[in-house]
Amino acid sequence: MQQLNPSEISALIKQRIGDLDTSATAKNEGTIVMVSDGIVRIHGLADAMYGEMIEFDGGLFGMALNLEQDSVGAVVLGNYLSLQEGQKARCTGRVLEVPVGPELLGRVVDALGNPIDGKGPIDAKLTDAVEKVAPGVIWRQSVDQPVQTGYKSVDTMIPVGRGQRELIIGDRQTGKTAMAIDAIIAQKNSGIKCVYVAIGQKQSTIANVVRKLEETGAMAYTTVVAAAAADPAAMQYLAPYSGCTMGEYFRDRGEDALIIYDDLSKQAVAYRQISLLLRRPPGREAYPGDVFYLHSRLLERASRVSAEYVEKFTNGAVTGKTGSLTALPIIETQAGDVSAFVPTNVISITDGQIFLETSLFNAGIRPAVNAGISVSRVGGSAQTKIIKKLSGGIRTALAQYRELAAFAQFASDLDEATRKQLEHGQRVTELMKQKQYAPYSIADQAVSVYASNEGYMADVEVKKIVDFDAALIAYFRSEYAPLMKQIDETGDYNKDIEAAIKAGIESFKATQTY
């Protein structure tokens, strides 16, 4: 039998003692003293930061929103029903982060970046903070490149540029979501990555949107962030910030991204609910005092950043490229009241608004854009040359038509010039009508608007304008494909292009039926 040497035993014991890790990680721990409606009040978390992740028993997390003298108010990110008074809560020392990167394209995720489309886990290499400071004035660049929405009425009269914030506002059932989805579909060949944030919508509605994006092939360059109506208010509050962080990944690397918030009215309602449960003092319409800041800090993150910013952010990996994040926030009004609290806030934050009207929608004018009060404050400098040159008279024609139409109701006999102006206005109104999921390219719009401006539609019946326009575009796409391709790629307008368009329209009118 082998005997152990006492010196060996002592050496072994010394080695074990030397290897023993006695370091301790100090965790700030508190006790839950109240749980109600997704809000917990925790006693004893002295070192909690605002917005810090709080860990509860059972792997559940919360977010610290109220830092009071003797307690912390936190909102639970998930099902709060498993939490009880007396359970422990721990600080994590981290703020909320979500996965970012190209791996999220084509996927549907919740407000925390977890996949909810049944297609397995997302192998994202990077995460980023949900709440970030927007780029400063020095790092920004003016908006001078277009985002084609595919809508004639928008691209000609209310153009949107890369890095712009353009509000889509209107009552329920006026086509706000349809316009946003069409804007995503129109980016098929533009290289713009898209993020669609659904806030407080029915799950069936979100499923329909995803299905339509898949059918049109748009899901390949789109991420859908969904916080449905059944999700906790905290998720609906966080979803826009999460989506914005996912979009910023592309902006900061010299690419272009488009984000749609559908809609921010429901986010404001969710935030009001959280604030009231946290016992914050209510203000106008029971919203908390910082509801303006809720939206301004979100929408300020949409911007066009300079090549220097991109180069600095990527440590020189990407040079000579500007990045942009374009935002199309949606606001739902009640009975057309644009002077309510949240609509006026968002109107003042954004760079213009597209106002959709119920009366126009019901009259069959779709998209139901009211060109009179819709405006784009910075998009004009981002329009392509050909659209800018040709679309100048469209808004004027519609404004004059509306004025004359109101006057003509009381006048029995009209002079020839007034009658012609009225008829031209009617034709332009018809021309702006468009089917859903059928975006017009730059060339398509150029041909349509040129035909209208030069009087080629004057002899076409008003009710046949839509059919005439569709037939004209189809003719140009088949017979003048190289010209259309040139216009789409360059956006230039010169005498040769004008002559070619003119010849094409005359040839169409001489040889085709419509």
Curated annotation (Swiss-Prot):
UniProt organism field: Acinetobacter baumannii (strain ATCC 17978 / DSM 105126 / CIP 53.77 / LMG 1025 / NCDC KC755 / 5377)
Alphabetical list of HAMAP family matching this protein: ATP_synth_alpha_bact
Enzyme type, top EC level: translocase
Site (Required for activity) residue list: S374
Subunit-level organization: F-type ATPases have 2 components, CF(1) - the catalytic core - and CF(0) - the membrane proton channel. CF(1) has five subunits: alpha(3), beta(3), gamma(1), delta(1), epsilon(1). CF(0) has three main subunits: a(1), b(2) and c(9-12). The alpha and beta chains form an alternating ring which encloses part of the gamma chain. CF(1) is attached to CF(0) by a central stalk formed by the gamma and epsilon chains, while a peripheral stalk is formed by the delta and b chains.
Substrates-to-products reaction catalysed: ATP + H2O + 4 H(+)(in) = ADP + phosphate + 5 H(+)(out)
Keyword annotations of the record: ATP synthesis, ATP-binding, Cell inner membrane, Cell membrane, CF(1), Hydrogen ion transport, Ion transport, Membrane, Nucleotide-binding, Translocase, Transport
Function field: Produces ATP from ADP in the presence of a proton gradient across the membrane. The alpha chain is a regulatory subunit.
Descriptive protein name: ATP synthase subunit alpha
Signal peptide positions on this chain: none
Protein location: Cell inner membrane
Binding site for ATP: G170, D171, R172, Q173, T174, G175, K176, T177
Membrane topology category: Peripheral membrane protein
Molecular function GO labels: ADP binding; ATP binding; proton-transporting ATP synthase activity, rotational mechanism
Family to which this protein belongs: Belongs to the ATPase alpha/beta chains family.
Superkingdom of origin: Bacteria
Any one GO cellular component localisation term in the record: plasma membrane
Source taxonomy: Bacteria, Pseudomonadati, Pseudomonadota, Gammaproteobacteria, Moraxellales
